[in-house]
Amino acid sequence: VYFDSIQQVNDFYGIPTLHPMVSVLHLDRSESEEVAKYQVHYGIYAIWLKETKGCNLSYGRTPYDFDEQTVTSFEPGQTVTVEITDQSVRPRCIALLFHPDFLNRTQLGRNIQRYEFFSYSSTEALHLSEAEVGVFKQVLDMIEMELNHPIDNHTRELIVSNIELLLNYCL
């Protein structure tokens, strides 16, 4: 599966596209059929909060160290294998997905490389406490709230600011 655009991701998971460059995806609300094992080639940035067990990730033959209440992140050019381990339950995951062009001419775009957790060399997820999960979800809620409003002159600035806030919490 190739995810080069937000539309491709949203189509794959069966959710509406509210903005062409950014999406907040709740996997448990997805309308897509669950596939037991597949590869994802990212052309966008993706930050996943996994709240439950039920799937494994790997880069090539290297397993990704993550479990419940963990954050995983991917940058354009990365490929990951997803394996659903329990077909009876859809994993509870929330993702923030954004196209690299969305960051053009922003401070975050100029500094995105400082967030080393996007790197292939990092195969460990960020493990969160209950309180940290709450903060993570609050920031995603703010982004989602902005996505549910019509796009205006402030949309991009507000969303980019919240993306940066979320990334800073992950440092």
Model-derived features with residue positions:
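Histidine-centered metal-chelating micro-motifs
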Residues: 54, 72, 77-83, 103-104
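Generic protein-terminus/edge-of-domain signal
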Residues: 1-58, 62-65
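A hydrophobic/aromatic-rich effector-binding and dimerization subdomain
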Residues: 83-148
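An amphipathic alpha-helical interaction segment
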Residues: 134-171
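Conserved hydrophobic/aromatic beta-strand scaffold that supports enzyme active sites
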Residues: 24, 47, 71-73, 95-97, ...
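Short acidic-glycine-tyrosine-enriched beta hairpin
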Residues: 61-75
